[in-house]
Amino acid sequence: MDIDKNRRIGLTDEQVKQSREQHGKNVLTPPLRTSLWKLYLDKYRDPIIQILLVAAFVSLILAFIEKNFMETIGIFVAVFLATTVGFYFERDAAKKFNLLTALSEEQPVKVRRNGKVMEIPRHDVVVGDIVLVEVGDEVPADGELIVCNDLQINESALTGEPVAEKSLEGGGDGAYPRNVILRSTMVMNGRGEFVVTAVGDATEIGKVAKKSTEQTSVETPLHMQLDKLAKMISKVGSVVSVAAFFIFLIHDILTNPAWGGKDYFYMAEIVLKYFMMAVTLIVMAVPEGLPMAITLSLALNMRRMLKSNNLVRKLHACETMGAVTVICTDKTGTLTQNKMQVSALELKQGDEALLDTAIALNSTAELNDGKPIGNPTESALLLWLDAQGKDYEELRKQVNVLKQLPFSTERKMMATLAEVDGETYLFVKGAPEIVMKKCIIEDRMLRQSAEELDEWQHKAMRTLAFAYKKIEVSIMRTSRTSTAEVVALLDANDLQLQAIAAIADPIRPDVPAAVQECRHAGIEVKVVTGDTAATALEIGKQIGVFEDEPENIGADGSLTSLDQQMITGEQWEALSDEEAYERAKDIRVMSRARPTDKQRLVAMLQKRGEVVAVTGDGTNDAPALHYAHVGLSLGSGTSVAKEASDMTLLDDSFKSIANAVMWGRSLYRNLQRFLFFQLVVNVAALLLVLGGSVIGTEMPLTVTQILWVNLIMDTFAALALASLPPSHEVMKDKPRKASDFIINKSIGFGILFCGIVFFLVMFALLVYCERRGKGGVDVHELTMFFTTFVMIQFWNLFNAKALMSHHTAFRHFLKDKGMILVLVLVLVGQWIIVTFGGEMFRTTPLSLHEWLLIIGSTSVVLWAGELWRTFKRMIAKRR
């Protein structure tokens, strides 16, 4: 295709078709989506689910022998519910994200085709198209410039360079030639036209996107914990059941004379009976409700976090945020407002009205309903005028511009010759070191201005100087004034210093407090930015990642020098892997960082056992976002960054990260509470089955009753405990180690203590009923026994709610609507089962007196827990 011939008219419809066939559409190929059936089957990789499936198939075989399929059906239902809930919520989040991605591809783009300028969707741009861009546009594809008028591009999304000057000539000291324009960069100033040379995956951003979707094998902390728990449960359950099988079988052989005969069918029945008991023990040891509790907790958190501006794309990210020990954050947009503002402006000579005019004229930026369009620095000056109640558009209308000399990197200043109230002025704006050399300044003013500028620059602010002079020559009052004449006026070096200004991208107001909250929670915050060392240092000081003192506390508690906490990308790259491994823990700020530097830092921190979260908004952040345990993209970030992330901060705020940590930690605590409740039920029920076999009675809890206790009630408990709101108290704790077992010593002790006590109470009741009755335990007594067991767990749900706190179980009780609903459901469900269960549940109706007696006597479980928590509160106060 002869591009030169198409510059004026653009491509024809036929050429567009040919180009699309040859080079493809202008769409970035999304990461290979897992098919729905594979996504669903992935849920069966959960180790707890796998144990349940084994138990279900063993139970199925026994069900054909025993002709009782209720238990088998119950286990399969538990598996189906747990896997389907998780699959549904992840699929729902993926759909929402795909919709956002699709909408971004519909952005209108101006192109020249068939000799006309028209707007087409971004995905329709093809190689060879002539694309027109101006201030505020996002570049839709890679290309080479053919028209360039003061074009400045924000390449920070790809190269980290905030403002890159473009020209028709190649070369330059940037990452790409100056005549090359790249997809997903933003036009900050000027206008231009370019020929598209690459679309879709062939663009530079497409190449980065491909790298960001490389598969990594970092296991999440929760998955490791569940794997460990599943192995422990399977070992304990297997050992206990096998031991019980042989103990009871040997006891029967030694005491039952039938073993001396030849009734082999009867002996096989005895073996089958004990084998059934062993399998029942294994099934009871496995917490069927745990996968449901986890998926419900994650799904509820996912929905709630969306309301607090966190769009969670992957369920595991909810919990993993609670285990985070390091947050690597970029600066622009996350810590700062990504909005330049005038921090200080000192008038030196002339009046304010003349300065207002100078600011309005020496700018190519615009404000659209208060929203800045164009160069960020010039936009900041217009916003400053607006804040002073001055209308820059009116100021521009009141003057007659004779000649304007645009800003260039060579001149480092901009000049405008204009007629104001019948007088001609030359207004100049630019770098202070350049502008002040062209001024006549008194020594005192020069020293004072130099000191102020130096102070601002050390605070990582961008500085500007304004100067002017009154022109007496009448010939200058024509529109034919040449550039050379304006340059000659500047070279006279007789300007008057009008003002100096400091412009900064201010820190978000809530960031310092959010950073401190994270640090108090034991989470190290590291700033990784492409800015200069001085700017990065100042940002670090402002948000509080380190203090102003020469010595600071390092990540391991040791004193670390400020130099040790600062590093540049170049210095980081020069370190060997061993040196980088040692240095990683103390780095607080990395300046002049490139994407590979950020990714290497994440890898080194993970190697040290840290759980790492990474924030980023640019395409250059995508690889690090993907490699981290949790990738946090910004709502205003590029589509590639969002695609690589696990969670999107819709409000771009670092405060949302602190909230996500709180949600994650609260979720983990709720899971621990559920485990405590569930395993107490399982331990007590398991011991009861063993105990019932010892005294020779039939199983005190039937299969259907066990299903109610173990499955339905546990699902209710999962709902109750998963729906507990997050607590700020968790932010006072240090991060847990990824290697720490989810059941710590105190929880483990509580499970065994409560489980054994509940068993002893229930076993004593069983023995009492056995010995009191002449013909064994009747159905009425077994109904009382069953209801007592359920009510003990009912009251223990309150203790689970208050687990790992000194507070009463009734704290914020009326706000816990999910808990209240579940308590009502358990009571109503138990009454229905007892009253109408009949032969299916082996129950008979109880009188009101019996109900009140059971409810009142079992409430001791709650009051004992309240006394223990009161005692702990008293001890804590004394300390």
Predicted regions and their residues:
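Conserved cytosolic headpiece of P-type ATPases
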Residues: 1-735, 740-743, 756, 771, ...
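Generic alpha-helical transmembrane segments
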Residues: 713, 758-759, 783-798
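Alpha-helical transmembrane segments of multi-pass integral membrane proteins
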Residues: 749-765, 791
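Long hydrophobic segments that form regular secondary structure
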Residues: 767-768, 772-773, 777
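Transmembrane alpha-helix entry/boundary detector in multi-pass membrane proteins
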Residues: 778-782
